[in-house]
Amino acid sequence: MLIFWAVLGGFLLDALFGDPAWLPHPVVLMGRCISALEKHLRTALPKTPRGELAGGAAVAAVLPLGTLAVTGLACWAAARLHPALGLALQMLWCGQALAAKGLAQESRNVYKELAKGALPAARRAVARIVGRDTQNLTAAGVTRAAVETVAENASDGVIAPLLYMLLGGAPLALTYKAINTMDSMLGYKNEKYLYFGRCAAKLDDAANWLPSRLAALLWVAAAALTGNSARGAWRIWRRDRRRHASPNSAQTESACAGALGVQLAGPAYYFGEYYDKPTIGDPLREIEPRDILRANRMMYAESLLALVLGLAVRLMLIL
């Protein structure tokens, strides 16, 4: 029952408080470790494709295994001191592994600026949650970027960590976050990270394969619950779920596009370079700022569905 209560408590902590700025966050420490490992390995190993592959593989092995070992040991030690302390630590880390409230808050900030007609401020707000260049985006481009990141992060910021914590508590959820953080820092297909980041990207693809597909199916159900088009979500997911360089990113994006009846993705600039990405969905209507709020409602609905279904399965296995 420890994992059951840890997951439920962690979900409620995230829903109520999100990630307070004053509270140290494990992902920040993971980021510092990745940067330190990268700096050391780039210095120690040959600056060749093989050397960079070896360095990236070392990071991709050390960080997840180290995270699992350290967090697992910490949870075990806390539980040995007192069961309530062990549960409290697991709840805290489960809450920190989830990003539903933070994602909703950041995307809502984008909506607020767009609603005021403050395009420069909206560009700055969306730049906090997307990787693309935002300085020249139109209002529709800013809206599209925010909706896409809500849809994609519903999978790797909510459903995936929720699945892993249901399987192995906070240690496994934070191990997943370590893999996801590596990919966000190293998994670029540019000159700097083409080889060094390859293992991190492949590991993230593997870790997200099942969660992203579960998230897409849950998004279809969430569309029905929130008054959006479940039929459209299902149809566009079936058609466009592979229209992305990543095997996972278009899963929830396509379901979201279909649910809203808008077109997402398409060409974008990253670090000054133009990428001709395929579009996802049909432009049945023009995208509008309120679509950010609609995407958030679907994200919350699928999160609750995942929690209820996951805890129900967990309870049945225990009983």
Region annotations inferred by a language model:
Residues 184:
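Glycine-rich phosphate/dinucleotide-binding loop and adjoining beta-alpha-beta core of small-molecule
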